């Protein structure tokens, strides 16, 4: 069952969370019941009529893959956490990181169309249908972030149960938002008062209503009356251009709607999962856009890839210019972001396209410091928003695979 994919999911989830909500209004929390309802929802999410054991839909291959994955990540993280005080070598860190990312890398390779007719099959089905699970990318982000923070020394304590709870938190399991371990545990430890929980519930209701508007009304109409008709003929320039607008708006309303649902259900647990979107199409430049679009992903890449690449190059003095090192870090950052989406050519080009936009904007910012604008008013602000919007939507056209 796809999280937030139909009304049945909402009904089952809300019924399952009813004791959580009642206890929340009383200013209490049952960690045991939270664990039970999480396990129940995980089994439901990964249930499958096709790929299962003993013809039991709730004993699915995806569920087994998820359990194996969680055990694998917990063993890796706890091993690194306990062995780090004795040996925090770079080689050990890299080894643990590679082993943590390995399941995701395998899934991305098996998903790729590069294999063509050479897809590996198992019992007359593609192997990818038996490997991996819904949300493996986002769960891997959590694990990798945690390993990095252990190396940095910012994580002082990890308990196995809290780690499992963090990795398998069902409201955000399929597509984020991507939370941080320290922030998650802080919310989990602090039980909100009855009044505080009422505020969380009111915010959750608002987000659920807005999410329905975004995902099930606006995104549905865009897909039905714009994207689907345009896909019938994308050979003309005008149709391709209109598809670019429609697809970009659909991506936002569909994913923003999902994110609102995920955050709302997190709030019902008393967990204030961070937001994912902040009016991204009002961005005045490409940097502003990535501070507004898929923010938890953007900030994850900024902290885990860009900043660490820049720090490494600075420490090793690989380049003389800090500006040049920053641009190389942008290139690394967005290249990895591209292949994270998939190893298809258009995903890689999408990542490199945004790297080029960042590097180009960096050059523009340096030039602008020496040549301050003569006019800066509402018109110039609106113009910058329009220009940024078109650069961004063209990137989404690349991302859609319809251009390449």
Segment roles from a protein language model:
Residues 1-404:
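Membrane-embedded transmembrane alpha-helical bundles that form the catalytic cores
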């Amino acid at each position: 069952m796809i999280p937030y994919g139909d009304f049945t999911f909402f009904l089952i989830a809300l019924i399952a969370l009813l004791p959580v909500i009642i206890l929340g209004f009383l200013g209490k929390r049952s960690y045991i019941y939270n664990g039970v309802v999480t396990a129940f929802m995980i089994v439901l999410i990964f249930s499958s009529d096709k790929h299962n054991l003993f013809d039991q839909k709730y004993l699915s291959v995806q569920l087994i893959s998820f359990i194996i994955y969680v055990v694998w990540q917990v063993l890796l993280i706890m091993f690194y956490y306990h062995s780090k005080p004795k040996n925090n070598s770079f080689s050990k860190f890299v080894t643990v990181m590679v082993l943590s990312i390995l399941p995701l890398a395998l899934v991305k390779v098996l998903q790729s169309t590069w294999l063509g007719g050479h897809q590996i099959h198992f019992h007359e089905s593609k192997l990818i249908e038996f490997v991996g699970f819904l949300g493996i990318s986002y769960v891997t982000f959590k694990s990798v972030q945690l390993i990095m923070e252990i190396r940095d020394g910012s994580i002082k304590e990890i308990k196995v149960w809290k780690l499992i709870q963090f990795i398998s938190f069902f409201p955000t399991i399929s597509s984020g938002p991507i939370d941080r371990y320290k922030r998650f545990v802080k919310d989990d430890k602090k039980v909100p008062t009855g009044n505080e929980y009422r505020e969380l519930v009111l915010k959750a209701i608002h987000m659920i209503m807005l999410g329905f508007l975004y995902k099930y009304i606006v995104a549905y109409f865009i897909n039905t009356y714009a994207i689907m008709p345009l896909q019938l003929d994308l050979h003309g320039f005008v149709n391709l251009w209109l598809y670019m607008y429609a697809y970009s708006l659909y991506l936002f309303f569909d994913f923003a709607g999902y994110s609102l649902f995920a955050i709302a259900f997190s709030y019902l647990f008393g967990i204030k999962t961070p937001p994912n979107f902040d009016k991204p199409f009002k961005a005045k430049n490409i940097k502003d856009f990535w501070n507004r679009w898929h923010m938890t992903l953007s900030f994850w890449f900024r902290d885990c890839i860009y900043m660490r690449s820049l720090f490494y190059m600075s420490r090793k003095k690989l380049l003389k210019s800090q500006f040049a090192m920053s641009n190389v870090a942008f290139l690394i950052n967005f290249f990895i972001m591209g292949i994270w989406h998939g190893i298809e050519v258009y995903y890689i080009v999408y990542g490199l396209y945004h790297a080029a936009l960042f590097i180009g904007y960096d050059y523009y910012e340096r030039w602008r410091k020496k040549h301050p604008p003569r006019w800066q008013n509402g018109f110039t602000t609106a113009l910058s928003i329009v220009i940024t919007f078109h650069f961004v939507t063209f990137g989404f056209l690349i991302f859609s695979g319809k251009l390449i």
